[in-house]
Amino acid sequence: MTRRKLGRMKVRPPDPETAQRYLLRFTGRQLYHEAERLPGLSSPELFGDQRPLELDVGCGTGEYICHLARSDPEANFVGVDLHLKSLHKAIRRAEEANLQNIKFICADFRQMYPLLRPSALRAVYLHFPDPGIKPRYRKRRLFNERFLEEMHRAVVPGGRMSLVTDDEDYFRQMLELIERDGRWRRAHEEPYLTGFDPPVKSRFQKMWERRGRTIYRFELVRP
């Protein structure tokens, strides 16, 4: 979905109390100059407890991560997205379910690496990231060597990373980087998987499936 279409999304912002409960906003200036003053991506810093933490990068309107939070109340979940209106919908979804174990951060994840903490994450989800269709945008793709390096530092040994894309070119890049990296073990014998049928699908997944796009997937484990 293009940013223009996302910009036309009609959604009412949460009231101040609800926003304070669920939402954090980090500007690029804060992340670049004041990262040490911001809470890190860990359960103690975000939730004040020691529960396992799972991270959804590019969570959109929150269908998938809210399902995860409902299904596992003994863990914490944080969704990151750059688009505030999408997060407003995600917050409404969390509020309607009265979820106590979820927060959302409005920020550019590429600037959030200083907030990662060693072995703080049980799982990371990167589902349907922006492929940057135009050649000049491809160098800005989130999934790259730096992403793999930072996730290896942040994910606990035995933790996992789930990667899903409908873009064949992005998939080929992911496959090449994973095979070259060597620090992650596939949770499946095949080089990759096709199809993705979670109990709750995001609006992006539904949209691409309606268009008949092939979905490529990797499930990785940090040894």
From Swiss-Prot:
Pathway: tRNA modification; N(7)-methylguanine-tRNA biosynthesis
GO molecular function: tRNA (guanine(46)-N7)-methyltransferase activity
EC number per UniProt: 2.1.1.33
Binding, S-adenosyl-L-methionine: 56, 81, 108, 130
SUPFAM superfamilies to which the protein is assigned, alphabetical: S-adenosyl-L-methionine-dependent methyltransferases
Keyword Transferase: yes
InterPro entries: SAM-dependent_MTases_sf, tRNA_(Gua-N-7)_MeTrfase_Trmb, tRNA_methyltr_TrmB_bact
Keywords linked to the UniProt accession: Methyltransferase, S-adenosyl-L-methionine, Transferase, tRNA processing
Disulphide-bridged cysteine pairs: none
CDD domains membership: AdoMet_MTases
GO cellular component, one term: tRNA methyltransferase complex
Chain positions recorded as substrate binding sites: 134, 166
Location of the active site: 130
Catalytic activity: guanosine(46) in tRNA + S-adenosyl-L-methionine = N(7)-methylguanosine(46) in tRNA + S-adenosyl-L-homocysteine
Function: Catalyzes the formation of N(7)-methylguanine at position 46 (m7G46) in tRNA.
Family according to the record: Belongs to the class I-like SAM-binding methyltransferase superfamily. TrmB family.
NCBIfam families per record: tRNA (guanosine(46)-N7)-methyltransferase TrmB (TIGR00091)
Protein name from the UniProt record: tRNA (guanine-N(7)-)-methyltransferase
Lineage: Bacteria, Bacillati, Actinomycetota, Rubrobacteria, Rubrobacterales
Gene name in the database record: trmB
